[in-house]
Amino acid sequence: MSKKKILCYVLLTAMLVSMFVAGEVSVAAEQQKPAYSNLADVKSRKEVRSALLSAGISAKTADAWLKDVVSYNKTIKNTSLVKKNFKKMGKKPPVYNENRISKLWLKKNKLFIGYNCRITAYDLMKDYIKVGNTGKANPSQLFMDRDALKNAPTKKFSGKQRKAFESIFSTVQTKYTKNVATHAAIWAKDWKNKKISVSCDTQASLISVVLHSSFSKTENELFVGHTGVLVPTKNHKYLFIEKLSFQLPYQVTRFESKEQLNDYLMGMYDTEWGQDTAK
């Protein structure tokens, strides 16, 4: 049976769980278009590093992550990347030369498939997310994440952090319904059972795209299909930090508002219509 997926959005910040629902928000006409960077130049890296530190992310964590970014960009020879600063987005998301990027990546990395969105987001947020009960995790969908961590050039997480990572991004059993509130309540209950908490000592937020997969009326799951970290800037805007996929680039996008971010994510990942799944 085919796997049906549709999206709901979860904003996880300072122990608050709230759902973004498609159609409830839209980008105001007077707002500037989002602009994105792949951190291929020193200036953009300094800007993002400053925003991370201001949000409470440690210099050690930020610098280690930026080292990963520089290494990745060098490996793919800056293919399809924004070479300097930030570039305004068009009506459609940026397009990357996946074929050339993949060839360049595989030329250097035989076993390591790269870091993805979940590994990147948790790496930045790991000091502020605590999991009290890791025994209830269902990491069945994280087989590629596990492979990436196993074959990474350096050990990314400690044993305790690895268990926390798998708990946070665990598959959650849900009901056969299109009601987003029902799925949100089930997701919140799962976090409560796992004793997952997000510290108030950071202004950074973990933003996750939660997929509802329906195999049948009795087999339904929720899973974080994409995630990133949102940090505020000094001029009251937001930077959304994400790794697009294992082999695709790091991307940092500047948004005028959280509503603009929601519209961006819906445009990227809301790809099904008329399915028996929640939106």
Predicted regions and their residues:
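Sec-dependent N-terminal signal peptides of Gram-positive bacterial secreted proteins and lipoproteins
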Residues: K4-V25
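Cysteine-nucleophile amide-bond enzymes
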Residues: G23, V27-K279
